[in-house]
């Protein structure tokens, strides 16, 4: 089986990353999500570069873990975090658990720069100021909707691990204020923005939408 190589350019190259994530070592079930999730544009917007140290919070089946691994190259590290319980959830579009899906991605993709963390956020075992970036993909609403303070506490905990100037990337299902976003598993951009600002994060001049 041919595997697409890890990107090794000194700076982020969207064309190289696109080539790396369209190889035969990637799951088709992940590939078909790309038109909606736009991962190359997301990483470009976040300023991801080779050699970075990144935490993929609740990596689940590893959609972003795989992409980050290819983007940061052999000198970088991706920490793919899941809880024991989370690893037991069924992976979308597959008849395996999320933990099994992630294990499979790491093995088949030869993702030697991925380190799994099977611990809760409150006990990650990482050093403060050690991360260049944290990815929170389709997760923040799960913290916010039961109790907005949980989302605030989560963001504050993550900020401790970021280096000065580090970035947190948040992607989520966009909710509409008058709808039941808890039932729909969504949250509004305004809700996410307020919690980020209250966590002492600074926001870019324009958040990407869509």
Regions found by a protein language model. Give the residues of each.
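Class I SAM-dependent methyltransferase Rossmann-like catalytic core
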Residues: 16-49, 63
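A short glycine-rich, Lys/Arg-flanked "PGG" loop and its adjoining helix->strand segment in the class I
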Residues: 69-70, 149-164
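Conserved beta-strand signature within the Rossmann-like core of class I S-adenosyl-L-methionine
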Residues: 79, 165-173
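Conserved Class I S-adenosyl-L-methionine
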Residues: 103, 180-206
């Amino acid at each position: 089986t041919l595997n697409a190589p890890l990107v090794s350019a000194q700076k982020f190259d969207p064309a190289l990353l696109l080539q790396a994530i369209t190889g035969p070592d990637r799951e088709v079930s992940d590939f078909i999500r790309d038109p909606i999730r736009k991962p190359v544009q997301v990483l470009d917007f976040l300023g991801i570069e080779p050699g970075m140290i990144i935490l993929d919070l609740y990596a689940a089946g590893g959609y972003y873990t795989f992409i980050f691994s290819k983007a940061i190259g052999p000198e970088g590290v991706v920490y793919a975090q899941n809880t024991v319980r989370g690893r037991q959830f069924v992976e979308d579009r597959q008849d395996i658990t999320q933990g099994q899906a992630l294990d499979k991605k790491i093995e088949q993709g030869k993702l030697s720069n991925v380190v799994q963390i099977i611990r809760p956020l409150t006990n990650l075992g990482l050093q403060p100021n050690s991360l260049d970036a944290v990815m929170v993909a389709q997760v923040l609403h799960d913290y916010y909707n039961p109790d907005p303070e949980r989302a605030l506490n989560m963001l504050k905990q993550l900020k401790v691990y970021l280096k000065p100037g580090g970035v947190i990337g948040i992607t989520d299902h966009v909710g509409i204020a008058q709808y039941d976003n808890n039932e729909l598993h969504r949250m509004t951009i305004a809700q996410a923005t307020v919690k980020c600002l209250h966590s002492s994060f600074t926001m870019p001049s324009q958040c990407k939408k869509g």
